[in-house]
Structure formats: structure tokens, C-alpha cells
Amino acid sequence: RRLDHPSGHWQMPQGGIDENENPEEAVWREMKEEIGTDNADMIKQSNQWINYEIPSETLATLPWGNMYIGQTQKWFAFRFKGREEEIDVSTENPEFSEWKWSDHNLLVENIVPFKRVVYEKILIEFKELFN
């Protein structure tokens, strides 16, 4: 659950790509920064980049305001190899207040509405992982 959004909706870990970093390097760094561990195997990455925009009424409620108006994302799927105790969202610069495992069938309804189309697209592209 995001710390900086008043809605109480959930979100998968995500983040930006730093200068001189490729998407694969970024996803490993972001995983470590946001959930405190990178004890996982990468099993799939999306074939496409997916865009979303944050609605202006939502931007007005966020502490970072208009600094980010949306994102273009490359998605990755991982198989976690560790123990649940390794997952710690109270990192140096926390973005989440709590975490949970979720069934993929319940994922979209728990996501902030403006990102639901993105999650629907990824669930379709990654559908073979859920059989």
C-alpha cells in the first residue's frame, strides 16, 4: 500500500531508470530499494512499454504535486526465492506502508483506478504465468 496516496489502494513496486542504467539494472535496484530484498529470479519481461497519466485531480492530492504526471513502464515478473521475513517495506526511503501477496484475479480491483488499464494489459501479457 502506498504511503503517499490517500486512497488506500495498492500498487506493485515500480520506479524510474537512472542515467546510464538499463531497464534490467533498474528493476533489480528498485526491488532492493522498495522491498528490501532482491532474492528472486526474473522469469519474464513485457514485450511492450505501457503508458499511463495521473489525473489532474489526483495530482492535486499528492505530496509531490506535478513533479511526475505519469510514467512509461516496462514490466517484469519475478519468482521470489526467499522467506517472507526478507521483505521489508520500511526501507531507507519508504514508499509503502505495508505489503501483501495477492491473487492475480484480485489485483486490478485493488489498484488505484487510473492504473487499472496498465495492470489489465500486463495480466493479459503475463497470463501463462498464472496457470
Feature-to-residue mapping (PLM):
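A short beta-loop-beta micro-motif enriched in histidine and acidic residues
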Residues: E92-F96
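Short, well-ordered alpha-helical scaffold segment located
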Residues: G16, G82, L106-L107
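Charged phosphate-binding loop/patch that engages nucleotide di/tri-phosphates or the phosphate backbone
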Residues: H104-N131
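N-terminal strand-loop-strand
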Residues: R1-M12
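Short, charged, solvent-exposed linker or helix-capping segments at domain edges/interfaces
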Residues: E86-T91, I111-P113
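Active-site-adjacent beta-strand/loop module that shapes the phosphate/pyrophosphate-binding cleft
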Residues: I50-E86, K100
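Structured beta->alpha junctions
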Residues: R1-R2, G16, D41, I111
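The catalytic Nudix box helix
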Residues: M12-Q48, D103
